[in-house]
């Protein structure tokens, strides 16, 4: 019997293997999780493809493109392989907190079409938090248009 995939994490990647590994490491390894990495034509002078992050991990699928068309293109490629009920789109330089699955599992059987999670922006060199203007704008928009938008949850 095939295990149902609840979450597909689709990660575009280009030339930051150390950050991609951190991202992968922050995603719990569970049978209901699929991790899809789409490398968008990384430079072989920067990336060692024989030791590519996630390549030998059971729940990780790695796809390579030669086009170099950007993160959106890579995400669309990943969508063609996604099997989950829910799609998550971290960037390669993102990483999750340890309570990620506690939050996600609250919504796994919900009827929402979209759940938007705010994120913290951190300056990596100093580990200093900074304002996340985009999250503030999205939250404001969603709260101001509740009558027009159905089945969206802002967490």
What role is predicted for each listed range?
Residues 45, 94-106:
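Acidic donor-binding/catalytic loop of UDP-sugar-dependent glycosyltransferases
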Residues 7-19, 23, 30, 38:
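A conserved hydrophobic helix/loop-capping motif in glycosyltransferases and polysaccharide synthases
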Residues 56-58, 73, 102-155:
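Flexible acidic/His/Gly-enriched loops in nucleotide-sugar-dependent glycosyltransferase catalytic domains
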Residues 87:
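Short aromatic/hydrophobic "clamp" motif used to bind/position activated sugar donors
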Residues 24-64:
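Acidic donor-binding segment of Leloir-type glycosyltransferases
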Residues 15, 27, 40-42, 69, ...:
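Conserved short acidic donor-positioning loop in nucleotide-sugar-dependent glycosyltransferases
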Residues 66-82:
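Glycine-rich, basic loop-to-helix element that forms the pyrophosphate-binding segment
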């Amino acid at each position: 019997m095939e295990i149902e995939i609840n979450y597909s994490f689709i990660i575009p990647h280009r030339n930051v293997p150390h950050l991609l590994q951190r991202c992968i490491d922050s995603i719990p390894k569970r049978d209901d999780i699929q991790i899809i990495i789409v490398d968008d034509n990384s430079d072989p002078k920067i990336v060692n493809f024989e030791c590519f992050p996630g390549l030998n991990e059971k729940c990780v699928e790695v796809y390579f493109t030669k086009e170099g068309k950007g993160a959106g293109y890579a995400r669309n490629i990943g969508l063609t392989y996604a099997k989950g009920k829910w799609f998550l789109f971290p960037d390669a330089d993102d990483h999750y907190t340890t309570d990620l699955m506690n939050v996600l599992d609250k919504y796994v059987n919900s009827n929402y079409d979209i759940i938007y999670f705010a994120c913290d922006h951190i300056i990596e060199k100093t580990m200093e938090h900074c304002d996340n203007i985009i999250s503030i704008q999205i939250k404001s928009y969603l709260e101001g248009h509740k009558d027009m938008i159905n089945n969206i949850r802002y967490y």
